[in-house]
From Swiss-Prot:
Cofactor: [4Fe-4S] cluster
A GO molecular-function descriptor: N6-isopentenyladenosine methylthiotransferase activity
Record-given protein name: tRNA-2-methylthio-N(6)-dimethylallyladenosine synthase
Keywords: 4Fe-4S, Cytoplasm, Iron, Iron-sulfur, Metal-binding, S-adenosyl-L-methionine, Transferase, tRNA processing
Any Gene Ontology CC annotation: cytosol
Species the sequence originates in: Staphylococcus aureus (strain MRSA252)
This enzyme's EC code(s): 2.8.4.3
Taxonomy of the source species: Bacteria, Bacillati, Bacillota, Bacilli, Bacillales
General function of this protein: Catalyzes the methylthiolation of N6-(dimethylallyl)adenosine (i(6)A), leading to the formation of 2-methylthio-N6-(dimethylallyl)adenosine (ms(2)i(6)A) at position 37 in tRNAs that read codons beginning with uridine.
Length: 514
């Protein structure tokens, strides 16, 4: 559904705050919201995507934020962090100024994550903590946005139980924030503006990037994989690729501004370009084009093994500014569990992909994601995950207990692995993760590595910290002037998840950019 169609069919619905908790909200959801539905969602076709390059904030909204401040609390993935940069850009264009003091902020937005129950619980706790602030300062605006806003159960819970919230908007209509804010200021009711269908791809949105060293670059939106445990295809919508020329222009501008590293973002970056109907162009082609731009480091995330092509492997193997680090979520090492998860690959095909990657990129660092305690996972099936970890020798992994998400196919399965069993398995897995991380780190002792210095260490302000091209954290002492620069560091000590070293020298740009 594009912007014109949406305007023609939109229905303005406001939820009255002073109604009783028993109020029936079904009419609201009938008109503007559809709860997650796998059967219906999978029917979504390859509709034409419209690209809006003429976005601009209406003059009548400029100045709305003069002498007002804002604060955004962000939960979740890199995509959410990037959305926060866009939201901040729009707010500053309206005249608002950022603040870090939640007690004085005039607009407080909570950008939410729906991937796990724990993340949602943190958000509800945060909203609850703001109730006293709303009583003390009734003129402030409190908003909830992000992936949780796309869930019916969440919106319903906020409407019924959190009257301190002034506005709710989702992942598809961030560019309508000026109108949402205006309505929130003028209305005595909670403003709910959630789109269940994707809109146009909006280019040239203002952004306030976090720092001037590393930058996120969105290359696509949404996901069509429908893994049975995942809510993302519902909260982020169908896959929509940005045009390559728009992405390349953005990366060139970041290079001109002096950024040292970019990360190409998407729920499944390996699907990039599949929906571009007029050209054959994939992530490998995009990486090739970006490799010619004078920016020292280029990363991409997140990858799905099913879509990882030999073309991509070949491009990464050529080196240059494409880093030799690939995050390749496996989730489980057992075929039966992978099938129930809807991952579309097998243990054998995953290991074959790993072999092809290692053959072409011998110095590659592989990391992964793993879910423990999926419904019906037996001890033997879990042990196959452990043996797969041994076979691959991942340098790091992000590990999680299975978290049931309403609206997903997995939510209909009986969560029949006891919590104590899940925790015990996670502990065993994490022990293995630490073991292989230590092995990977130990290889750096005595070596000199190139580090992108990002700032002071979180533990010691007198120590600087940064990351290698393989995403290894390095702590070292050096002049503060090195922040934002590529430097050489000799590694003196390898810890399990970080490295300590001694500053050698600054790296000249021509030594890095090829």
């Amino acid at each position: 559904m594009n912007e014109e169609q949406r305007k023609a069919s939109s229905v303005d619905v406001l939820a009255e705050r002073d109604k009783k908790a028993e109020k029936d909200y079904s009419k609201y959801f009938e008109h503007v919201y559809q709860p997650p539905n796998l059967k219906e969602a999978k029917k979504r076709g390859k509709q034409e995507v419209r690209y809006n390059r003429d976005f601009q904030i209406d003059e009548k909204y400029r100045g709305m934020g003069n002498e007002r401040t804002f604060l955004i609390k962000t939960y979740g993935c890199q995509m959410n962090a990037h959305d926060t940069e866009v939201i901040a850009g729009i707010l500053e264009a309206l005249g608002y100024q950022a603040t870090t003091d939640i007690n004085t902020a005039d607009v407080i937005l909570i950008n939410t994550c729906a991937i796990r129950e724990n993340a949602e619980n943190k958000v509800f706790s945060e909203i609850g903590n703001l109730k006293h602030l709303k009583k003390e300062r009734p003129d402030i605006l409190i908003g909830v946005c992000g992936c949780m806003s796309q869930e019916e159960s969440v919106v319903n819970k906020i409407l019924k139980s959190y009257q301190n919230v002034d506005m709710i908007f989702g992942t598809h209509n961030i560019h309508h924030l000026p109108e949402i804010l205006e309505e929130a200021y003028l209305s005595k009711a909670m403003v709910v503006e959630v789109w269940s269908k994707e809109g146009d791809v909006i280019e040239n949105l203002p952004k306030v990037r976090e720092g001037n060293i590393k930058a996120w670059v969105n290359i696509m939106y949404g996901c069509d994989k429908f893994c049975t445990y995942c809510i993302v295809p519902f909260t982020r919508g169908k896959e929509r690729s940005r045009r390559p020329e728009d992405i390349i222009d953005e990366v060139r501008e970041l290079a001109r501004e002096g950024y040292k590293e970019i990360t190409l973002l998407g729920q499944n970056v390996n699907s990039y370009g599949k929906d571009l109907q007029d050209i054959e162009y994939d992530l490998g082609d995009l990486l090739q084009a970006i490799s010619k731009i004078a920016i020292p480091r280029v990363r991409f995330t997140t990858s799905h093994p099913w879509d990882f092509t030999d073309h991509m492997i070949d491009v990464i193997s050529e080196g240059g500014n494409i880093v030799p680090h690939i995050h390749l979520p496996v989730q489980s090492g057992n075929n039966a569990v992978l099938k129930i998860m809807g991952r579309k690959y097998t243990r054998e095909s995953y290991l074959d992909l790993v072999k092809r990657i290692k053959d072409r990129i011998p110095n590659v660092a592989l990391t992964t994601d793993i879910i423990v305690g999926y419904p019906n996972e037996s001890e033997e099936q879990f042990e196959e995950t452990l043996t797969l970890y041994d076979e691959v020798g991942f340098e790091h992994a992000y590990t999680y207990l299975y978290s049931q998400r309403d609206g997903t196919p997995a939510a209909k399965m009986k969560d029949n692995v006891p919590l104590d069993v899940k925790k015990e398995r996670l502990q065993r897995l994490n022990k293995k993760v630490g073991h292989y991380s230590q092995i990977a780190m130990s290889k750096y002792e005595g070596q000199t590595v190139t580090v992108l210095c990002e700032g002071s260490s979180k533990k010691d302000d007198q120590v600087l910290a940064g990351y290698t091209d393989k995403n290894k954290l390095v702590n070292f002492k050096a002049p503060k002037e090195m922040i934002g620069k590529l430097v050489e560091v000799r590694i003196d000590e390898a810890k399990q998840y970080s490295l300590n070293g001694s500053f050698v020298k600054e790296v000249e740009p021509e030594m890095v950019i090829q």
